[in-house]
Amino acid sequence: MRTAPTILHLDMDAFFASVEQASKPSLRGKAVVVGGLGPRGVVATCSYEARVFGVHSAMPMGQARRLAPHAAYLVPRFELYRSISEQVMRLLRELSPLVEPLSLDEAFVDLDAGGAARDAETARLAGTKLRTDIRTVTGLTGSVGLAASKMLAKIASEAAKPDGLVLIPPGTERAMLEPMTVRTLPGVGPATGDHLRRAGITTVGEIAEAGEDELVRLLGKAHGHALYAMALARDERPVVAERETKSVSVEDTYDVDIHDRVRVGVEVGRLADRCVRRLRASGLSGRTIVLKVRRYDFSTLTRSETLRGPTDDPAVVREAAARLLDSVDTTGGVRLLGVGVSGLADYTQEDLFAQAAGDRAEEPAEEPGTEPAEAHSPSPAERRWPSGHDVRHTELGHGWVQGSGLGRVTVRFETPYSGVGRVRTFLVDDPELTPADPLPLVADTEGGAGQPSSGPLPLPASLPKSWSGGGGAAATSRP
């Protein structure tokens, strides 16, 4: 393990919810929940204000509504989240060529590899500057952990939340880890934690005291060896730049089981088109098409077909997905469908036979009711108004959907740069109201530095956790 705290872990604070608060002045400082809003929806993330009421990620949306009935419930805007994530990742790549993204809002950075830090002092300066740059470019906050290993850097960033920085000086790792619960260590979930608790082991220090042989006896060879090493603060894993994408996929869960076989086919076609758009956006193609079907009884079936060469042609992917669907019995009802592409490559091999078959497969898609929804501009009566999504009115300007139903849609007219806006209600087919693209969170920027027009978002009134390290082993800083 290295001798300087030059591995940085960044975790954006309540990322999806923070984006929504930054773009909607009326939601700043309020409880915000982002996720699927149907009866089977789950929470993707929530603001710290919502966490005070017990709401958390992966919770069923119905339970979240019971805990926080007055929160704002919004449909995710993934394209906006990806765009902001790329702004953050560009800032990380300015620090080092070794950036390991873990998700849209989380990444490791090897500061030593880029010359950005060589010791604790320069690492702290780099982490502080990064947090300032993220706030300037995106208007959002992120928490930074600095340590000599990936495991410790991630533990430090958790302790820094929200909007803080924690540095673990080399030589203090064991003292910092010992009083922490076993669940602090990566790979220790509820089952392993309960198993250790029944053996009288509840802290990381007690894991180290138990010894490697006892841990192997309790947990098996691989897990026992790994857990013992982590308890001793040993972690030699390097930061791996831009881990290779293995597959691209999309899926939808339906509020009501689909029984109509024709509609199932239409949904599979739409998913295939969405998957190809994501594939092309990444500059990739693939040769293995995968269909996922979750039936009414929660049984999940996966079917795949490998083509003769990579493709990014929507007709080819649609036809392959349709063939796979032919082998699946859906008569009892379908609650989830997914289409994916694996065997990825950065080039496309033309397959004339598949292309010709795909052209034929496209013809039925032009019939009413079977064309993918995104392939044409819907009339006003056909439009959906997802809660939280952007709209524009010809007279009132930019706003977002607060809710819709009973033939009405309610819109709040405000932007990231305005004050709290006024609310108006329209008929869902009002010709002056149209869907709109999201506005940048920071005004007057072009992918670079700028200033949040209405100031930084305030810290939540109630912080979710506090640093539990002992003896001053870690240094914590907040604005």
Swiss-Prot record:
Keywords from UniProt, A to Z, are:
Cytoplasm, DNA damage, DNA repair, DNA replication, DNA-binding, DNA-directed DNA polymerase, Magnesium, Metal-binding, Mutator protein, Nucleotidyltransferase, Transferase
Q: Where is the UmuC domain?
A: 7-189
The protein's Enzyme Commission number: 2.7.7.7
Could you state a single Gene Ontology molecular function term?
magnesium ion binding
- Active site residues according to the UniProt entry: 106
Kindly state which reaction or reactions the protein catalyses. DNA(n) + a 2'-deoxyribonucleoside 5'-triphosphate = DNA(n+1) + diphosphate
Q: Lipid metabolism: is it a keyword of this entry?
A: no
Q: How is the cofactor bound?
A: Binds 2 magnesium ions per subunit.
Q: Which stretches are tagged as biased composition: Basic and acidic residues?
A: 381-396
The cellular location(s) given in this protein's UniProt record come to: Cytoplasm
UniProt-annotated stretches for the region Disordered: 357-400, 430-479
Query: SUPFAM superfamilies annotated for this entry?
Result: DNA/RNA polymerases, Lesion bypass DNA polymerase (Y-family), little finger domain
Question: A Gene Ontology CC term for this entry?
Answer: cytoplasm
The record's section on InterPro entries has:
DNA/RNA_pol_sf, DNA_pol_Y-fam_lit_finger_sf, DNA_pol_Y-fam_little_finger, DNA_polymerase-Y, DNApol_IV, IMS_HHH_1, Rev_trsase/Diguanyl_cyclase, UmuC
**Site, as annotated: Substrate discrimination:** 16
Assembly state and interactors? Monomer.
Q: Which family does it belong to?
A: Belongs to the DNA polymerase type-Y family.
Function comment: Poorly processive, error-prone DNA polymerase involved in untargeted mutagenesis. Copies undamaged DNA at stalled replication forks, which arise in vivo from mismatched or misaligned primer ends. These misaligned primers can be extended by PolIV. Exhibits no 3'-5' exonuclease (proofreading) activity. May be involved in translesional synthesis, in conjunction with the beta clamp from PolIII.
Q: What is this protein called?
A: DNA polymerase IV
